[in-house]
Design a protein with these regions (language model features):
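Cytosolic, long alpha-helical scaffolding segments
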Residues: 1-97
């Protein structure tokens, strides 16, 4: 999940770097923003599977489970924030066209 978050941030940064030239000529902004959404969807699936796996192990240390779930939540929330930023960039582009 963390590597997907890093890739999503990199694609968002690339899209933002291209934003000033968007109106002057064609860029790959949309491609990068779609990749961010794809990473977020993949991250959602991994989050659900990982959370289920955490609670499926009846012998797991409850404190370790809580900590692991908190870490999963943090990464998922960060990915949601990156997707939200990408959606805002898409809205700005739509208004400019």
């Amino acid at each position: 999940m963390v590597s997907m978050l890093v890739y999503a941030c990199a694609d968002l940064k690339t899209a933002l770097d291209e934003l000033p030239t968007f109106l002057n000529h064609s860029t790959d902004i949309e491609k990068h923003l779609v990749k961010v959404q794809s990473y977020e969807s993949d991250c959602d699936r991994i989050y659900i599977d990982a959370a289920h796996a955490l609670y499926a192990d009846k012998d797991a240390d409850p404190q370790a489970v809580r900590l692991s779930h908190a870490l999963l939540d943090t990464v998922e929330e960060a990915m949601d924030s990156v997707e939200n930023a990408a959606e805002r960039v898409q809205a700005l582009i739509a208004q400019s066209v």
